[in-house]
């Protein structure tokens, strides 16, 4: 993340707070509340954060990463890390990748 311009920075707070709430309440079986309508904007923000993280990693690849690493590997690596790292969620991410 270092050196990246996060286009979705305003969503960061709304994305992190539910994760803390979720970790506290998951053991009580109320995680289903996350899917309630009032949390929809959190899910959208988290999706945007992950998309920007993927775009950032693709940009970093051009500067720092080994030349032989394929785009698909970069995307897979980012996709494995970002959903749980940023939101603790695993719902599908729809991203427009840079050309």
UniProtKB/Swiss-Prot annotation:
Alphabetical keyword list: Antibiotic, Antimicrobial
Job description of the protein: Has antibacterial activity against Gram-negative Klebsiella sp. but not against E.coli, Proteus sp., Salmonella sp. and Xanthomonas sp. or against Gram-positive bacteria S.pyogenes, S.aureus and Rathayibacter sp. Has no antifungal activity.
The keyword Hydrolase is annotated on this UniProt entry: no
Subunit structure: Heterodimer.
InterPro entries in the record: Bifun_inhib/LTP/seed_sf
Species name: Sesamum indicum
Disulphide bond pairs: none
Family membership: Belongs to the 2S seed storage albumins family.
GO BP terms: defense response to bacterium
Origin superkingdom: Eukaryota
Name of the protein in its database record: Antimicrobial protein 2
Chain segments annotated as transmembrane: none
């Amino acid at each position: 993340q270092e050196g990246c311009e996060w286009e979705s920075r305003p969503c960061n707070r709304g994305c992190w707070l539910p994760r803390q709430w979720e970790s506290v309440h998951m053991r009580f079986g109320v995680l289903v509340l996350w899917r309630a309508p009032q949390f929809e904007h959190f899910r959208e923000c988290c999706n945007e954060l992950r998309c920007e993280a993927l775009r950032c990693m693709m940009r970093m690849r051009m500067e720092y990463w080994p030349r032989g690493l394929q785009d698909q590997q970069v995307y897979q690596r980012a996709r494995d890390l970002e959903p749980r790292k940023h939101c603790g969620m695993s719902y599908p991410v729809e991203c427009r990748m840079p050309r």
